């Protein structure tokens, strides 16, 4: 009897232990099947950002200790895109190095899915589902086994890797903190449903850079539609400054589309370098502005920072979440640092006769307290008498507070008999300029009350008016505000 009671207690304790283990989920490795994971997770080091020194292996606890994984710091997970060579591209170590320079104590993990990424594009695109699943299982393992907070996890995916990051975020048991999509791939994803591509629901915050969205939506290298909480389109999301369009077209004509990977690389990959720029040049953040269309942005109608209408590009983006996707635009330089300074210019052209000219070339020069920027070219699609025109210009240097500007109307590159018989000229009294970066507005006056602006003639000079008008009539101000808000709203 004593033996029987003892055996009963032992059996009862065993059952109780099993129940407790099952309820607490204390053995996640028993519940997870890591055998199907083909992606590799390389924990890069600051000393060797271009080398796969140590791999973290899901299900193997000792790999975390062997690779010196920091359990108390941020973790960046970098996911590359489609590859022709089957090798890492040169941007990978550059991004790793920049992340460590900004966050020295962090963990920077590079996801290696090169074998799957080297297939024909449609095949590799389909593999993003499996890669996303691999990454999700890896993240869940870290969270469940070590109670690693997913608030410390930031996924960064380029091209196809952006969609793999989105799928991973949708599959984790708890949401990761942030996903940054670096020009997410367009083909096969432009019209895809949210579960199989990057979407705002995949993380607490999703920000996206679109740098190569040329052509029809189904043929655009980068996805055109907004897929995050904030979607930023540098230079309209089209061809990027410094990327030689003429050379690309020449190579296409000579070699066809066999080398398309190299031809589109410059603009497509610019998304990565813009993010790297935000890591390295913390003191020179690029500013983006909310706008409905790039056409409205080109007119300078969206340089407002009211109610979160402007934001930093890249790492230090302000996390603004709205009910709808927020589209933002900005201009950049051709190389690092990419920051420029945006200005809206408004001019009213007075004329005795009703004259309209199209596609007119102009030059504007700005002079300020810190520097100057001369002969900035811009083209007005239309110039008409007795009408106000607004347009966007930008400078690559910080001019400081504006003091003076010059405006010149260039001659056409072709000869026009009408210009010879009836030379065109307008009268300008004032020029209004608004800075996007400082939000300051300045009104410039002609020294003589009004200045003649003639085609091919000398530049008209305007200086800062002695008395800056506060505002127009209240009704007019409200109307102007409503018009700008219509363009800026997302």
Swiss-Prot record:
Heparin binds at residues 430-441. N-glycan at Asn-70 is a triantennary complex oligosaccharide containing sialic acid, galactose, mannose, and N-acetylglucosamine, the reducing GlcNAc being sulfated at C6. Disulfide bonds join 54-67, 243-266, 291-310, 302-305, 445-465. Changing residue 346 to N: Reduced heparin-binding ability and some decrease in specific enzymatic activity. Coiled coil: none annotated. Changing residue 309 to Q: Some loss of heparin-binding ability. Residues 243-266 are annotated as: Essential for determining substrate specificity. Changing residue 430 to N: Reduced heparin-binding ability and some reduction in specific enzymatic activity. Almost complete loss of heparin binding and greatly reduced specific enzymatic activity. GO terms for molecular function: apolipoprotein binding; calcium ion binding; heparan sulfate proteoglycan binding; heparin binding; lipoprotein lipase activity; lipoprotein particle binding; phospholipase A1 activity; protein homodimerization activity. Changing residue 307 to Q: Some loss of heparin-binding ability. Residues 1-25 form the signal peptide. GO terms for biological process: cholesterol homeostasis; chylomicron remodeling; fatty acid biosynthetic process; fatty acid metabolic process; high-density lipoprotein particle remodeling; low-density lipoprotein particle mediated signaling; positive regulation of adipose tissue development; positive regulation of chemokine production. Its EC number is 3.1.1.34, 3.1.1.32. Residues 341-464 form the PLAT domain. The active site is at 159 (nucleophile), 183 (charge relay system), 268 (charge relay system). Ca(2+) binding promotes protein stability and formation of the active homodimer. It is a peripheral membrane protein. It is an enzyme of class 3 (hydrolase). Residues 480-490 have a biased composition (Basic and acidic residues). Key enzyme in triglyceride metabolism. Catalyzes the hydrolysis of triglycerides from circulating chylomicrons and very low density lipoproteins (VLDL), and thereby plays an important role in lipid clearance from the blood stream, lipid utilization and storage. Although it has both phospholipase and triglyceride lipase activities it is primarily a triglyceride lipase with low but detectable phospholipase activity. Mediates margination of triglyceride-rich lipoprotein particles in capillaries. Belongs to the AB hydrolase superfamily. Lipase family. This is Lipoprotein lipase. It comes from Gallus gallus (Chicken). The gene is LPL.
């Amino acid at each position: 009897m004593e033996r029987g009671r003892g055996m009963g207690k032992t059996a009862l304790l065993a059952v109780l232990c099993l129940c407790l283990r099952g309820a607490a989920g204390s053995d996640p490795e028993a519940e997870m099947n890591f055998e199907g994971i083909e992606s590799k997770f390389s924990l890069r080091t600051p000393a060797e950002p271009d080398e796969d020194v140590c791999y973290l292996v899901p299900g193997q606890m000792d790999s975390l200790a062997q690779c010196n994984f920091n359990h108390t710091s941020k973790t960046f997970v970098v996911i590359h895109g489609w590859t022709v060579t089957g090798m890492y591209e040169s941007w990978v170590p550059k991004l790793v190095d920049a992340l460590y320079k900004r966050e020295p104590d962090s963990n920077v993990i590079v996801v290696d899915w090169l074998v799957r990424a080297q297939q024909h594009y449609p095949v590799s695109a389909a593999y993003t589902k499996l890669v996303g699943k691999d990454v999700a299982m890896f993240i869940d393992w870290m969270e469940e086994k070590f109670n690693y907070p997913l608030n410390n996890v930031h996924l960064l995916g380029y091209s196809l890797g952006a969609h793999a990051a989105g799928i991973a975020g949708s599959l984790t048991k708890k949401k990761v903190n942030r996903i940054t999509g670096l020009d997410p791939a367009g083909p096969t994803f432009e019209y895809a449903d949210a579960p199989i591509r990057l979407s705002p629901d995949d993380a607490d915050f999703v920000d996206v850079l679109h740098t190569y969205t040329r052509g029809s939506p189904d043929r655009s290298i980068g996805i055109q539609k907004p897929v995050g909480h904030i979607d930023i389109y540098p230079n309209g999301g089209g061809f990027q400054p410094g990327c030689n369009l003429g050379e690309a077209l020449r190579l296409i004509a000579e070699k066809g589309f066999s080398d398309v990977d190299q031809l589109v690389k410059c603009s497509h990959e610019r998304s990565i370098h813009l993010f790297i720029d935000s890591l390295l040049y913390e003191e020179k953040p690029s500013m983006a502005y909310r706008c409905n269309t790039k056409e409205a942005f080109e007119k300078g109608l969206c340089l407002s920072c009211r109610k979160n209408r402007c934001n930093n590009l890249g790492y230090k983006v302000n996390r603004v979440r709205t009910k709808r996707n927020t589209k933002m635009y900005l201009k950049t330089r051709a190389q690092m640092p990419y920051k420029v300074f945006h200005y809206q210019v408004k001019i009213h052209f007075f004329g005795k006769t009703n004259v309209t000219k199209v596609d007119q070339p102009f030059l504007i020069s700005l002079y300020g307290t810190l520097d100057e920027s001369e002969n900035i070219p811009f083209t007005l699609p239309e110039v008409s008498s007795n009408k106000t025109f607004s347009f966007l210009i930008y400078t690559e240097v910080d001019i400081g507070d504006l003091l003076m500007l010059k405006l010149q109307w260039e001659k056409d590159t072709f000869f026009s008999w009408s210009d010879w018989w009836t030379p065109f000229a307008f009268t300008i009294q004032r020029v209004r300029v608004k800075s996007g970066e400082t939000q300051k507005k300045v009104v410039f006056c002609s020294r003589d009350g009004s200045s003649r602006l003639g085609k091919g003639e000398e530049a008209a000079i305007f200086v800062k008016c002695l008395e800056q008008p506060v505002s127009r009539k209240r009704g007019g101000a409200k109307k102007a505000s409503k018009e700008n808000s219509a363009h800026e709203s997302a």
